[in-house]
Amino acid sequence: MSIVSLLGIKVLNNPAKFTDPYEFEITFECLEPLKHDLEWKLTYVGSSRSLDHDQELDSILVGPIPVGINKFKFVADAPSPDLIPASELVSVTVILLSCSYNGKEFVRVGYYVNNEYDLEELRENPPQKVPIDHVVRNILAEKPRVTRFNIVWDNEGEEEFYPPEQEEPEEEEEEEEDEDEDEEADEDAEEDLAEEDDVDDGEGEETAPEKKKLKRDPKKSTASDVKNDEGESQAESLGPEEDEEDEEEAEEIDLEKESDSENDADLPTPQDTTQHK
């Protein structure tokens, strides 16, 4: 937070001749007592192509600064035309009004300045050598460009101005390590499950041929003529459906026999027929 705040700047003599001094009325506010003075400085930008033509018009020290709102008048001399390129004497340029505390700049205000001839004849037919007495300036006071900078004041230390490093990244590293351990545990569990599946698949492969053999034997063998290696009949290997079919056939044969016997008992013999006659 800035201890000194710029509240306003008023350009007093505007427009004015090129050779007239610059006059400003500056208002600022001081929130706390200051140990050092404030340095105000006005700079004229002589060329847009090089900093070598910049001129420091004036600088003053203001202090001691009481707490509250303060106002003062800043007057600076006009720039020297000999230090400005002839092609840029009559043109648009910039002036910079800045303030520093303890050698550190904390605010800068820039204004555009339009330099032109005061006579219409000179504007239409500009001479080779610029007559400075006929050049006037007009500061665009309604459109200033303000830039502020953070500095260390009396009640602030370097440690307070630059906050200490936080320990949050270390906690994040610990959380990342815990996540890595959890991922490793999950991978181990997946490997164990994969090994168990491999074992189960191996056992299934061993028993599979036996099942295939049992399925093939009933098709090639019957209960009456095929014997296994131990001499046992393979009729037992037949399915329950075949046993039921055999039982049904046996019952049909018995029924046929019974019906034949009944018919034989009812029909008379040839001898009996002759006796009735």
UniProtKB/Swiss-Prot annotation:
It comes from the Eukaryota. It is found in: Nucleus. Residues 155-207, 239-265 have a biased composition (Acidic residues). GO terms for molecular function: histone binding. Residues 154-277 are annotated as: Disordered. One of its GO terms (cellular component) is nucleus. Keywords: Chaperone, Chromatin regulator, Nucleus, Transcription, Transcription regulation. InterPro entries: ASF1-like (IPR006818), ASF1-like_sf (IPR036747), Hist_deposition_Asf1 (IPR017282). Interacts with histone H3 and histone H4. Belongs to the ASF1 family. Histone chaperone that facilitates histone deposition and histone exchange and removal during nucleosome assembly and disassembly. This is Histone chaperone ASF1. It comes from Kluyveromyces lactis (strain ATCC 8585 / CBS 2359 / DSM 70799 / NBRC 1267 / NRRL Y-1140 / WM37).
